[in-house]
Regions:
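Flexible, glycine-/basic-rich loop-and-beta segments that form/coincide
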Residues: 1-46, 52-54
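Polybasic, glycine- and aromatic-enriched phosphate-binding surface used to engage nucleic acids
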Residues: 30-231
Length: 231
């Protein structure tokens, strides 16, 4: 409680002025020196796609084929981190992740009139769920209710909710993505900024070395900088 805290710490005003993240306290002590570089210095970091209804917009290969939906409006999307055993995702010749659980995002950019004439099966699928799905907050706030956010495949992704991975014991995982899959909002997508991107283009081993360094980071350092979630 406020009057009988489990943990307390006295932090000087000067330390607080230098500290960008006060939620580190009281678990952590004041930093001896300020970190000069952050991940955002090297990467543009975006959360993954919030679909509005994963069950409707994210389908398996079997579901797509059973419904007779056109492959032209789907692109691969990574499953939940718990379905990815390794921290490196390989791809087949089509860029689809070589995972046991392969999922695809419905990502159609055509207006409804065009969908109706070009893809009748897709039109029927959209119409069947329009009443329930289109009225959801994220969907109804879009220009067209089934349009998805633009998230290109990222070479590096991070599981960021901060709950410890039971297999590795790590609160965060950095995944090296060789596929053309995007990801949902249980991931952060890391896109190299121009300077790093140019360096990676000249040295194709650099992305792997960066990934190895990120996964070697001390868990305490990551937890100290990450968001805090309840539950």
């Amino acid at each position: 409680s406020l009057f009988t805290p489990t943990l307390s710490r006295t932090v000087s005003a000067s330390a607080l002025r230098k500290e960008p993240k006060w939620t580190r306290f009281p678990v952590s002590e004041a930093r001896e020196e300020i970190i000069h570089y952050q991940l955002s210095d090297f990467f543009t970091i975006k959360r993954g796609i919030a679909t509005g209804d994963n069950k409707f917009f994210i389908l398996s290969r079997d579901q797509i084929e059973a419904l007779g939906l056109p492959w032209a409006v789907f692109r691969p999307i990574l499953p939940s981190p718990r379905y990815i055993a390794d921290d490196e995702v390989e791809a087949d010749n089509n860029g689809v992740p070589m995972l046991d659980r392969q999922l695809f995002l419905l990502d159609c950019r055509l207006p409804e009139e065009k969908v109706k004439t070009t893809y009748p099966a897709l039109w029927a699928y959209l119409e069947h769920a329009k009443k329930d799905v289109a009225s959801r907050y994220l969907c109804r706030s879009r220009k067209v209710w089934y349009f998805q956010e633009e998230r290109s495949p990222a070479p590096l992704m991070c599981t960021y909710l901060g709950r410890t991975d039971t297999k590795s014991g790590r609160p965060f995982r950095f995944i090296l993505n060789h596929s053309r899959a995007t990801a949902a909002n249980v991931y952060l997508l890391l896109y190299p900024k121009p300077v790093l991107a140019r360096a990676m283009a000249q040295d194709h081993t650099l992305i792997r070395r960066v990934w190895e360094v990120l996964n070697a980071l001390c868990p305490d350092a990551l937890l100290g900088e990450g968001r805090v979630y309840g539950g």
